[in-house]
Amino acid sequence: MGIQLYTLRDHIKTAPDFDATLARLKKMGVGTVQISGIGDIPAEEQRAILDKNGIDVCITHKSLDRMENDLDALLKEHEIIGCRDIGLGCAPKELRGNTANVGEFLRRTDAIGRNMKAKGFSFYYHNHSFEFEKLEDADTTMMEMIFEKSDPEFFGFIPDVAWIHFGGSDPVEILERMKGRVKVIHFKDYILDENGERRFVPLGQGRVDLKACYEAACKLEIPYIMYEHDIDWPDNDPFKACEISWDYMMKLQNGEI
């Protein structure tokens, strides 16, 4: 289990902040992170700070542009930080919404996945809720098209259980359909406020059956569970959100929930 650093993105923009943030997480008991939203810190310096704090990187989120146009440098950076799994955090708007756009998304990510695999790396895609919405021109969804048309050898998933749930699907069922294609799962929770608006909350305080998701992740032998909390932190403090959620994750792991 670990923390998706996008949760703490405002606290990893400089090398000193990255160091201080990792030290704080290590003190909590965190030994693994996902890197996302980090500032312009050279990979060598990132690695030194990671090693200093005894923390490993299980996966990253990087841009589609770098995957397509700067791949060699991107892979070199990942070699330096000791990570061979790279995620795309979201499909651009022009690559979703209808079958033609999704087809182009699949074509481009297939090429990326093949290029990465040829060099010993793996491509993964992180979902939101729009992948579970009906397309404009077909009685299907983007996620169904991905399931039907992507090649498991070159296209993996980073399933986000809150976004799956908010999109109207059962996270456990989706995890089972992704079997063998997941290395990292995102644990996230949310509520609907009095106006019906989505608001993220610390783990265990919302609508997602995280115990069922945890049991499914164990059954499917998914190696990593990362806590992610995009916005809406308690007291506007992402560290407080991490502390509350980390305690929940440890209780899950220890069978106390």
Roles of regions detected by a PLM:
Residues Q4-P16, T60-M67, G97-A100:
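Active-site mouth loops of central-metabolism enzymes
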Residues E45-I49, A73-L74, D170-R177:
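A short acidic, amphipathic alpha-helical/loop segment
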Residues M1-M28, E79-G82, T140-P159, W163-I257:
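Histidine-acidic metal/acid-base catalytic patches
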Residues A23, G39, D56, L64-F157, ...:
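Active-site acidic/histidine proton-transfer and metal-coordination neighborhood
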Residues D10, P42, M67, L95, ...:
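Generic structural signal for helix capping and beta-alpha/helix-loop junctions
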Residues Q34-L50:
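Glycine-rich, proline-tolerant flexible connector loops at the mouths of alpha/beta enzymes
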Residues Y6, S36, K62, G89-A91, ...:
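Active-site-proximal beta-strand/loop segments in catalytic clefts of secreted hydrolases
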Residues P42-E44, E68-L71, L210-K211:
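Short, well-ordered alpha-helical microsegments
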